[in-house]
Amino acid sequence: MNVLSYPPILDAISLVHLRKEVEYFYPLGYNKWIGKYDEPENTVERYILDSFDFLLSSQYPTAVGFEWWIENLDGHNTITLHSNHDDNYRKENGTLKYPLLSTELYLTNDIDPTTILDTKQGKYWEQYENNPPTEVVFSAPEEGKFIVSDPRYMRGVFGRCSSRTTLCYDVWDYKPKNLNRVGIVTKPFDVRFYKQEPSSPVQWLGKTKKMQLSINDQQFFKKFPNKYREGETWKVTQ
C-alpha cells in the first residue's frame, strides 16, 4: 500500500506551540487553504509550508498549495470512511478529482488508530476499486508522528470520544474552489524539524479482532491487531 510513516518530525517545543494554536483554531468550520508561495500568517501555515519543503517538495514539484483541516474526536467517536477529493468539483461535474498526496500529523498520544483501507474511490462517487479491501493499515497516534498516503484510499477513525487531535493537509496541483486562508494572524513560531526517514507499515502476524464496516452498502469485516502501542503502524492482510 502507498502509505508511509515518519517517526516524530517535530521537537517538543515546536509541538507544544503548534498544538496550542490548533486548539485555538478549532473548530474551523470549513477546510482552509495556504498557497505554496504565500507568506505564513500563523504557526499552522508555517508548519504546513515548512514540512512540505523539508520532507516532500522534491517528490511533488507540480504542487501549488495545500488544503488543510483539523480532526478531533472530542464529543464523538467516529470519522466515517472517506477518500480525500475535491468535493465542490464532484458536486458541479459529477466526477472526482484528487490531490497529489494526503498527510496527517498526530498532536496527541492515543490508542485509536487511523484506519486506511486499500479500497480506492474511483472517478465516480459510487465507484470503488478493490472493494472489499484485501489489506488495511492501522496507524496508532503518537505526538509528532507524520503519515502520508494515497488520497484515494478509504480511511476513517473508529474509537471513543477523546481528545485525539490531528492536523491534516492535502497537496494539490491546482486550487479547488471555495477554499480560503484561515485569516487568523498570530506570530508564527519557527517550527523545528527532525530529519526522519519514512518506513512502510509492518506486516502484522499476531492475533486479530474483527469489526464490521460497509462501503457503498457492501458490508465486510475488517481484521485489526488485538493489541498495539502508541506510534506503531501495522498492515493487516484481510
Positions of the model-derived regions?
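Generic cytosolic/nucleocytoplasmic N-terminal low-complexity/intrinsically disordered segments
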Residues: 1, 144, 206-208
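Non-heme Fe(II)/2-oxoglutarate
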Residues: 1-69, 76-79, 184-190, 229-237
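Selective for proline/serine-rich intrinsically disordered segments
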Residues: 5, 25, 38, 139, ...
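Catalytic core of non-heme Fe(II) oxygenases with the double-stranded beta-helix
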Residues: 62-191
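Double-stranded beta-helix
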Residues: 115-117, 163-212, 219-224, 228-237
